[in-house]
Amino acid sequence: MDLRLIFGPTCTGKTSTAIALAQQTGLPVLSLDRVQCCPQLSTGSGRPTVEELKGTTRLYLDDRPLVKGIITAKQAHERLIAEVHNHEAKGGLILEGGSISLLRCMAQSRYWNADFRWHIIRNELADEESFMSVAKTRVKQMLRPSAGLSIIQELVQLWREPRLRPILEGIDGYRYALLFATQNQITPDMLLQLDADMENKLIHGIAQEFLIHARRQEQKFPLVGATAVEAFEGPPFRM
């Protein structure tokens, strides 16, 4: 079975690459992002809109309310194996994402070492200036999405439920927005009414949080198992 894996740090264009590949091959894309399994976090987690999908199919490892918490890496890995098995007779699958814990689960599992032909695209982390430019553009889109709620509207809506607050405080983007509100002595709902200067500071701060996460991803990702640019068989990763 052919598996096309696209992985790398946040804000490096994985999703757009996966969509383009899906258009070329007709294969569905399976997201390897644990936060994207919660539709209530669609914008903040970077779920592409229907328009952005351009007619391609995107699958998720789960579809759960935030009250159930973020799916664990172990559960996500089990779901991943099941999805791959389900698509075995359909010609292949595109795997796309940047979950450190899930990719490390894959690296530690013997399941992936045989019976697959791997095509791997590893997106690299750009220099800080280039990354911040891309990340700020992404955050601006999250604040004013073409469809659905903004990241702040998602936050405000979910913050009303006290038991969801610890979960939100642990997720990039939402975490910094809450910190920004605290530092400026405002409530989360007041983030919807920022002036241009304050909004730019919020955008910069969220982008910096993404940079910190991207650097951690770059350090913690497992190494690709083969140096060949072309497809290969055998373990996809080496620890």
Curated annotation (Swiss-Prot):
Assigned EC number: 2.5.1.27
The residue range of the signal peptide is none
Going by the UniProt record, its keywords in alphabetical order are: Crown gall tumor, Cytokinin biosynthesis, Plasmid, Transferase
Looking at its record, which EC class is this enzyme? transferase
Among its keywords, does the record have Transferase?
Answer: yes
SUPFAM superfamilies tied to this protein: P-loop containing nucleoside triphosphate hydrolases
Its GO biological process annotations read: cytokinin biosynthetic process
Q: Does the keyword Transferase apply?
A: yes
Catalysed reactions, as listed in the record: dimethylallyl diphosphate + AMP = N(6)-(dimethylallyl)adenosine 5'-phosphate + diphosphate
Record InterPro entries? P-loop_NTPase (IPR027417), Tzs (IPR002648)
One GO molecular-function annotation for this sequence? AMP dimethylallyltransferase activity
Q: Which family does it belong to?
A: Belongs to the isopentenyl transferase family.
Q: What does this protein do?
A: Transfers dimethylallyl groups to AMP as part of the biosynthesis of cytokinin phytohormones.
Provide the protein name. Answer: Adenylate dimethylallyltransferase
Species assigned in the record: Rhizobium radiobacter
